A protein has these predicted regions:
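Residues that mark the start of a beta-strand
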Residues: 2, 85, 124, 185-186
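Alpha-helical recognition/docking segments in bacterial nutrient-uptake
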Residues: 2-115, 119, 177-179, 193, ...
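Hinge/beta->alpha junction and helix N-cap segments in small-molecule ligand-binding domains
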Residues: 9-21, 40-49, 102-112, 128-173, ...
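Alpha-helical structural signal in soluble globular domains
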Residues: 26-30, 78, 139-151, 197-205
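Periplasmic-binding protein-like
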Residues: 61-67, 126-128, 160, 181-191, ...
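Conserved H-loop
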Residues: 123, 154-156, 208
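Flexible loop/turn connectors
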Residues: 175, 180-284
């Protein structure tokens, strides 16, 4: 008995991404308890659906987990047509199909993060986000924009960047924002990995995290980056991706055991954890 996790070649780096690794750690513990093996497969982007069809035809897997869903996600309808049990880690906003999913409330998380910065007195707030086509990134942008709108703050499009969530991209995008004629006094970012890149950019410009530029990050509670300090370095919206892996596995195993059950969605709320990276803006 086997559960499949297919990763496209364009997302090959995800195989060593600590977010993916922690998700797999949570899921695989559940698989092992239920007697299932885990299959990782790296496939060309254009052959991803073909790979699903071949796995289903050969009965090579009992179910699959879909990673990194886009706003417009074709894999969901394709898998429903194959009658192959699956669960999506995340959601796809433009998909009308019914499907199993586990997701964090991304819009609410980034609304709360932006609202906190506004309450501290910030009016120039940047957003360093994930790839725009990804559903989580779209929802986080929506939460950020909604907080600004509800506080009558104009959205500065130059303050919004999208890229893959790596440390170098966090650094590069932070430099772009810091080089603006009126740089933001605060930044919200989608990953603690990117936050570390932002911090490197601040250090390079001899700016102090929190004092000169406030930063709030989304924190997937990664085992590799866990902060044991009484006051964390970063103020963060925190939701355990390992727990998301466990819940995704539970939901998939239920569906395998009872293929006729109605699809289910699980929405997780992120905690807002106060750290030392957020303070009122300094007078300019």
């Amino acid at each position: 008995m086997t559960i499949g996790h297919l990763v496209s070649v364009s997302k090959e780096h995800e195989m060593v991404n600590p977010i993916f690794a922690d998700f797999i750690a949570g899921a695989s513990a559940r698989y092992a308890q239920s007697g299932y093996d885990l299959l990782h497969s790296l496939v060309p982007d254009e052959d991803e659906f073909t790979s699903y069809k071949e796995l289903a035809a050969r009965s090579a897997v009992d179910g699959v987990v879909v990673h990194a869903p886009r706003v417009d996600e074709q894999r969901i309808a394709q898998l429903n047509n194959l009658n192959l049990p699956f669960v999506v880690h995340g959601r796809s906003s433009n998909t009308v199909e019914k499907y199993n999913w586990v997701d964090v409330n991304n819009e609410r998380s980034f609304f709360r993060a932006t609202q906190l910065l506004i309450e501290l007195g910030h009016r120039s707030i940047g957003l360093i986000n994930g790839v725009a086509e990804m559903d989580f990134a779209m929802r986080r942008t929506r939460g950020y924009r909604r907080a600004l709108k509800e506080n009558n703050i104009a959205v500065a499009e130059a303050y919004i960047t999208h890229s893959e969530m790596t440390e170098p991209n966090g650094y590069k995008n932070a430099i772009t924002l810091l080089d603006l004629p009126t740089p933001p006094t605060a930044i919200v970012t989608s990953s603690i990995i990117m936050a570390n890149g932002i911090r490197r950019a601040l250090d390079e410009r001899e700016l102090k995290l929190g004092r000169d530029v406030s930063v709030i990050t989304h924190d997937d509670d990664l085992s590799y980056f866990r902060d044991p300090a009484a006051v964390p370095v970063y103020t963060a919206t925190r939701s355990s991706v390992r727990e998301a892996g466990r819940l995704s596995a539970d939901l998939l195993l239920k569906t395998i055991a009872d293929p006729g059950r109605d699809p289910e969605g699980i929405l997780l709320d992120a905690e807002l954890i106060l750290g030392s990276s957020t303070k009122p803006p300094r007078p300019r």
